[in-house]
């Protein structure tokens, strides 16, 4: 089993799809890496030689940010937006959609479970 950037690639899959198991590498990037290293897309992960795995590893380390480094950079970017106090940062702080979606009826994934408002105040008024 090939291990690249701390991720075990599935043996039976073709290498172009196996590389997409690494955070930060999609199909397009996977194909760019394989073109740069001269490895066929059709090759299975199990059929790769140690030299080919080393070439892929080297290409990824030199030209791409993946896994932990990429996750850290994304979270730092979000944190800097929040620290700046810009609109996008405030939306992140409030847990609302950031990219302009409507929130009157949708956005349940981002807002979480519904909170009933009227029933709580009605029960408090009876006492």
Curated annotation (Swiss-Prot):
Annotated spans, Disordered: 100-127
Keywords in alphabetical order: Ribonucleoprotein, Ribosomal protein, RNA-binding, rRNA-binding, tRNA-binding
Parts forming coiled coils: none
GO molecular function: rRNA binding; structural constituent of ribosome; tRNA binding
Disulfide pattern: none
Cross-referenced InterPro entries: Rbsml_uS13_C, Ribosomal_uS13, Ribosomal_uS13-like_H2TH, Ribosomal_uS13_bac-type, Ribosomal_uS13_CS
Pfam families tied to this protein: Ribosomal_S13 (PF00416)
The organism's place on the tree of life at top rank: Bacteria
GO biological process, one term: translation
Record has Repressor as a keyword: no
Record's compositionally biased regions (Basic residues): 101-116
Cellular component, GO, one term: cytosol
Stored HAMAP family: Ribosomal_uS13
Role of this protein: Located at the top of the head of the 30S subunit, it contacts several helices of the 16S rRNA. In the 70S ribosome it contacts the 23S rRNA (bridge B1a) and protein L5 of the 50S subunit (bridge B1b), connecting the 2 subunits; these bridges are implicated in subunit movement. Contacts the tRNAs in the A and P-sites.
NCBIfam families: uS13_bact
Subunit structure: Part of the 30S ribosomal subunit. Forms a loose heterodimer with protein S19. Forms two bridges to the 50S subunit in the 70S ribosome.
The family this protein is said to belong to: Belongs to the universal ribosomal protein uS13 family.
Protein name stated in the entry: Small ribosomal subunit protein uS13
Top-level taxonomy: Bacteria, Pseudomonadati, Campylobacterota, Epsilonproteobacteria, Campylobacterales
The encoding gene: rpsM
